[in-house]
Every structure is written in C-alpha cells, then in structure tokens.
C-alpha cells in the first residue's frame, strides 16, 4: 500500500482510505457490530490506515463508536482517523449546518468521547454554515489544534472563496468532496485551487455511489437503499446511465480488471494528493477496491476512460434535491466584520 502526504502540514496516510459510513446503515441495513469491526480490521490488514467517519453517520454517532471499538483492536498510532462535524439537522426539509465556536468545540469533545481517543487526526467541517463567517469557525478549530485535541483541519464541500478564507486563518490539510468518473465538476476550479494552496483532495463516492460496482445495473437495488430515490438511479436516468457502466465494463476487460477497479484506478491516478475513501460492507468488495492500486494507467488510458463517460450524457443530478443547497457551489459565508 503506497503512502502519501495529505496537505503540507505533515499528515501521511495510505493512498486508499476507507469510508466507514455504510457500516452503520446509511446505504443499506447496518452490519452487526462484530461484522463491522471485522471489515475495518481487514481494511487495516490490507494496508489501509486512513479511516473516515462523521458524527452524523449511524444513529446518535454510532459510526464513530464502531470505529472507536475497532481501534481498540488495532495500533492506534498507525491509524489516521478523519471525522466530521457541522451537520446540525438533517431531514426531509434538507440539511442545516452549524459552525459557531461553541458548537465546534462541543462536537469535538463528543467525537473524542465516542471514538474513545485522545486526539482526532483530521477534523473536517462536514458542511459549511453559510450564516457564520468561515473565519469564526476556523478560529475555534485553530484553538483545538493548539490544545492537541485535533491534529489537522479539513473542509468538506467548501466553495473556492471559503477554502481561501479558511486557509488564511489556519492551514487546511484536506478537502473532502464528491469526485468520480461521472462527477467531475471540481476539476476546473477546486482542484487547481487546492494544488495552489497545498491542500489534499479526499474524494467521497469515488465509484459513483456504487454505479461502477454494477449491482444497480445487474439486479435491482434493495428497497431500503437510499439509492432507490437518488436522481441518477431512478427510471429513465438509470436506463441512460447503464450505458455508461457498460462502456466502463468493456474498457475494464481491456485492462484485465473489474469495472470498480478501473473507475477507482482513474480517481487514484488523478494525482499523488488524491486519496479516495470508498466504503463497503463486504470483505470481497474491500479486496476488489484494494486491487485498483495494481491497475496502471497511461495518460492515453485516462483520456480514453474519461471520454467513455461524457458528462453531458450523465443523466440526473449527483445529489438529492433536498441536500443540493449544501453542495460546494452554494458554500460561501458572510464576510467577517
């Protein structure tokens, strides 16, 4: 497993991370605790040391608690824990973010307790509170770094202006953002800005919310999956998007790998500073994901793969309408007065 630097502040992680969200049932049924811990331990055995969670995953922070229990069976000092705060409310009416200093601190304390750790390696603002100047939120995070409660600061779904202003208060180590073969809207402005500032990029949903795994193509999704209402997985949109999958499937045969491995390898090849965090509940899928690291792609290969997924042919928005307003395009904050 290759190791890379995220950001310029010294954080070193495995080139492939692991997203823990799905273990607590945010996509399908939650795994029994022992099975969830077994998946995390096997990820570590495969060389993955960078684990991603959030205070909003599972019920009442249960995903952080699960990771915390797994950490008790692993060498803590060899693991980089990334967790997130800032989603204050989530429901049918949408998502409300909160970035006030007292909320920042209380979330950090609660995450430390649930994870049962002395420090958090990477603490992200999960979604941007557009009512609070980002300098205010970052100021409190800077204090938490100085106190040793967190080591590095990250942003998620932040706009270019917010990234610049946050980074001016305290160095931002990583930006977590959706990035995959069929969601590439960060390439024009966000990626160059992160590189200019020395901020690592952590793509979530790097295999297209599972599209390139093929389950939604070859069989019907489980009724309880959140994807059954996702714009890209319903009705005519899914029928159109199946063609994208079939093109990647054909290219994967040429490269002697699975469609998932090709889609993930494409993301991994976007730069040393790009560390995707795919998640899964199954050991065999975990091994399949790790296998993407063996797929070597040339510049010509990367272009051919990109061209097989013309963005104007992708049917449906990348996120549910109710949470679209929390996307990076709407994540500016008021000026500091």
UniProtKB/Swiss-Prot annotation:
Q: What is the effect of changing residue 57 to A?
A: 99% loss of activity
Q: Which cysteines are joined by disulfide bonds?
A: none
Q: Which Pfam families match?
A: Aldo_ket_red
pH dependence of function: Optimum pH is 7.0.
Its Gene Ontology cellular component terms are:
cytoplasm
A Gene Ontology MF term for this entry?
aldo-keto reductase (NADPH) activity
> Which Gene3D superfamilies does the entry mention?
NADP-dependent oxidoreductase domain
The reaction(s) this protein catalyses: raucaffrinoline + NADP(+) = perakine + NADPH + H(+)
Q: Which amino acid positions bind NADP(+), per UniProt? A: 205-214
Q: Specify the effect of residue 126 to A.
A: 98% loss of activity
What family does the entry list? Answer: Belongs to the aldo/keto reductase family.
Which parts form a coiled-coil structure per UniProt? none
EC annotation from Swiss-Prot or TrEMBL? 1.1.1.317
Q: What is this protein called?
A: Perakine reductase
Positions annotated as active site in the UniProt record? 57
Please indicate if the UniProt record lists Signal as a keyword: no
Task: Describe activity versus temperature.
Answer: Optimum temperature is 50 degrees Celsius.
Q: Which GO terms describe its biological process?
A: alkaloid metabolic process
What residues bind substrate, as annotated?
126
* InterPro entries recorded: Aldo-Keto_reductase, NADP_OxRdtase_dom, NADP_OxRdtase_dom_sf
**Enzyme class of the recorded protein, top EC level:** oxidoreductase
Q: Extract the PANTHER family matched here.
A: AFLATOXIN B1 ALDEHYDE REDUCTASE, OS01G0618100 PROTEIN
Q: Which domain of life is it from?
A: Eukaryota
- Keywords (A to Z) from UniProt: Alkaloid metabolism, NADP, Oxidoreductase
Q: Which gene specifies this protein's sequence?
A: PR
